[in-house]
Swiss-Prot record:
Quaternary structure note: Component of the SRB8-11 complex, a regulatory module of the Mediator complex.
UniProt-annotated location(s): Nucleus
GO biological process, one term: positive regulation of biosynthetic process
GO molecular function per UniProt: ATP binding; cyclin-dependent protein serine/threonine kinase activity; metal ion binding; protein serine kinase activity; RNA polymerase II CTD heptapeptide repeat kinase activity
Protein name: Serine/threonine-protein kinase SSN3
Principal cellular location given in the protein's record: nucleus
Reactions catalysed according to its record: L-seryl-[protein] + ATP = O-phospho-L-seryl-[protein] + ADP + H(+); L-threonyl-[protein] + ATP = O-phospho-L-threonyl-[protein] + ADP + H(+); [DNA-directed RNA polymerase] + ATP = phospho-[DNA-directed RNA polymerase] + ADP + H(+)
Family: Belongs to the protein kinase superfamily. CMGC Ser/Thr protein kinase family. CDC2/CDKX subfamily.
Biased segments, Polar residues type: 169-185, 518-536, 573-585
Gene designation: SSN3
Organism, as annotated: Kluyveromyces lactis (strain ATCC 8585 / CBS 2359 / DSM 70799 / NBRC 1267 / NRRL Y-1140 / WM37)
Length: 593
């Protein structure tokens, strides 16, 4: 069968092979007698023979590089030496705050060279940067049936396309109808100066927020993988694209640390509430209050329509830009909930800050719904009205992570305002694990109306939507789509504004930045220092005068304590050799047993 085939371009179809072992005359064998390795060797030898030039001067065959070139050590060194430091691209202005999972800094972009190698940077400015195998199953994102019936022309959110600009100023009017994620129309007043943060003039300085995720031990470089919170936040922020969610710009992987660069917001609701409550109480204007709530619910609606729970909504996580655009931030506790059979309780026994935690969570619910976010939104709404948390309880600290204590004091604060629930208000209340604890508590009547009037509230529609957001039964609690359709937002008195600061005759103070904090040690103030660090391999830079390990700096006292502990351990373990690991910033440490 092989003798009849004349195609000699493929060596596997040649009628006859001549194998040359390089040590003399080759051996003639039929293809049936050749192994796969011999066929490949014969093919390679034939290619080398065909590439030899005519004449006696033949070039030696190409020799493969040694295995050392492709080993992980030299490869990692080359990659580390060519990577871009976060300090090379951004100038750190100051330290903002620290949370459970990381520290946040304010920064601005440096004069950056486009020709630099950017292997350690994940650019997210364009939708093309989103990979096809993203963590979010885009095909599984469906809208509810009632939303499709409400607006057949509104298509499903596509993460790979930039968000649609819903706010389009008309030619000759200052008010228009805008369409929310739910498909409902709302009267909104448009200000020509209220274009969002992405449309700044080129002459204006663009600021960024850089979040550095905490490591297991500060000042110690180690490979222990990426935390669950960091994975969730990075994967979700890469996919989500909504005007009322903070936008992720890029991600840096540097010195075994992760840095998330996001758009910067000058204010947050906690700061605004503090401004209105100190030194004397001044209520938030009704139009500003309504506009803030509409934009929060629009962002929450977008998350829930895409099967995502935020699980940590509170005033400190609601940002407001200088243009008056409200943005939901900090998705460290967010997660998908499309699999309703799987419990959401495992591994996340404590979620949502205690003052904004829904009653079903306090009662030990294993399977919870997006209603927990709407309860938190109701608590935020009440705090914006009264300028203090409506349910300000004391959290009982857990002695063990294996069990979650019943937060009796927090639930009592809820009962004092909302009254005691019964089976008529909450039919399946007795099915929760901690129901017996609730049954032992004193009985209270509903005092929300009295609380609202005492806080200075006058709008009855605002009180009605507050009642619906703070329903005990999560099944009866209003969802984000219906909340956007509530008469409180649709009556147009006052109208919802894209710029929540519109009409104010005062300005809120900028966010407080700590420029003399020990943790940043004046990082980013010297451009020459950043350019010099660009030329030095990052893995060998242990003599940094500012002690800037792990990218954005480590407290010198921590390094000194670590060095002292290492010296003490060396003295106790080696007797006469106390200088094995000292004074080098902890670059050489003993392995943990």
């Amino acid at each position: 069968m092989y003798g009849n085939q004349q195609n000699n371009s493929n060596p596997y179809q040649m009628s006859y092979y001549r194998m040359n072992n390089g040590q003399g005359q080759g051996t003639n064998r039929w293809p049936q007698q050749l192994s796969h390795q011999e066929m490949l060797a014969g093919h390679s030898q034939q290619i080398l023979n065909n590439n030899k030039p005519a004449g006696n001067q033949s070039k030696p065959p190409i020799v493969m590089a040694s295995n050392n070139v492709f080993s992980i050590g030299p490869y990692r060194q080359r990659k580390d030496s060519s990577r871009i430091s976060v300090l090379q691209k951004y100038e750190i202005i100051g330290y903002i705050a620290a949370g459970t999972y990381g520290k946040v800094y304010k920064a601005k972009a440096r004069d950056y060279q486009n020709g630099m190698n950017r292997d350690n940077v994940i650019i997210l400015d364009s939708p093309d940067s989103v990979s096809a195998d993203s963590n979010l199953d885009i095909n599984s994102i469906n809208r509810s049936t009632r939303q499709q019936e409400a607006n057949d022309n509104l298509t499903t959110m596509d993460f790979r396309k930039p968000s649609h600009k819903r706010f389009t100023p008309p030619n000759n009017s200052n008010s228009t109808q805008i369409r929310s994620n739910s498909g409902s129309e709302t009267n909104v007043r448009i200000n020509s100066s209220s274009i969002t943060n992405n449309s700044r003039k080129p002459s204006q300085i663009q600021f960024y927020a850089i979040k550095k995720f905490k490591t297991e031990r500060e000042g110690v470089e180690h490979y222990t993988g990426i935390s669950q919170s960091a994975c969730r936040e990075m994967s979700l922020c890469r996919e989500l694209d909504n005007n009322h969610l903070t936008k992720l710009v890029e991600i840096f992987l540097e010195k075994k640390s992760i840095y998330m660069v996001s758009e910067f917001a000058e204010h947050d609701l906690l700061q605004i509430i503090h401004f209105h409550s100190h030194p004397e109480k001044r209520l938030i204007p009704p139009r500003m209050l309504k506009s803030i709530m509409w934009q929060i619910l629009d962002g929450v609606s977008y998350l829930h329509q895409n099967w995502i729970l935020h699980r940590d909504l509170k005033p400190a996580n609601i940002m407001v830009t200088v243009d008056g655009c409200v943005k939901i931030g900090d998705l460290g506790l967010a997660r998908k909930f499309n699999n309703m059979v799987q419990t959401l309780y495992t591994g996340d026994k404590v979620i949502v800050t205690i003052w904004y935690r829904a009653p079903e969570l306090i009662l030990g619910a294993r399977h919870y719904t997006p209603a927990i976010d709407l309860w938190a939104v109701g608590c935020i709404f009440a705090e914006l009205i009264g300028l203090r948390p409506i349910f300000k309880g004391e959290e009982a600290k857990m002695e063990s992570k294996k069990s979650v204590l019943f937060q009796a004091n927090q639930f009592q604060k809820i009962l004092e305002v909302m009254g005691s629930p019964d089976h008529k208000i909450w039919p399946n209340i007795d099915s929760y694990p901690e129901y017996l604890q609730l049954a032992k508590m004193p009985k209270y009547r509903d005092n929300l109306t009295a609380w609202y009037q005492t806080a200075g509230g006058k709008d009855k529609t605002a009180l009605d939507i507050l009642y619906r957001l703070l329903q005990y039964d999560p099944i009866k609690r209003i969802d984000a789509i219906d909340a956007l359709d509530h008469v409180y937002f649709t009556n147009g008195d006052p109208p919802v504004c894209e710029n929540v600061f519109e009409g104010l005759n005062y300005k809120y103070p900028p966010r407080r930045i700590h420029t003399n904090d020990n943790d940043i040690t004046n990082v980013g103030n010297d451009n020459n220092q950043a350019n010099h660090s660009q030329k030095q391999p990052m893995h060998g830079n242990n003599n940094n005068k500012n002690g800037n390990m792990n990218g954005l700096g480590v407290n010198k006292r921590i390094l000194a304590a670590a060095a002292a502990a290492a010296a003490a351990a060396a003295v106790s373990g080696n007797g006469n050799n106390p200088t094995s690991n000292t004074a080098t910033g902890g670059s050489a440490r003993k392995k943990r047993k």
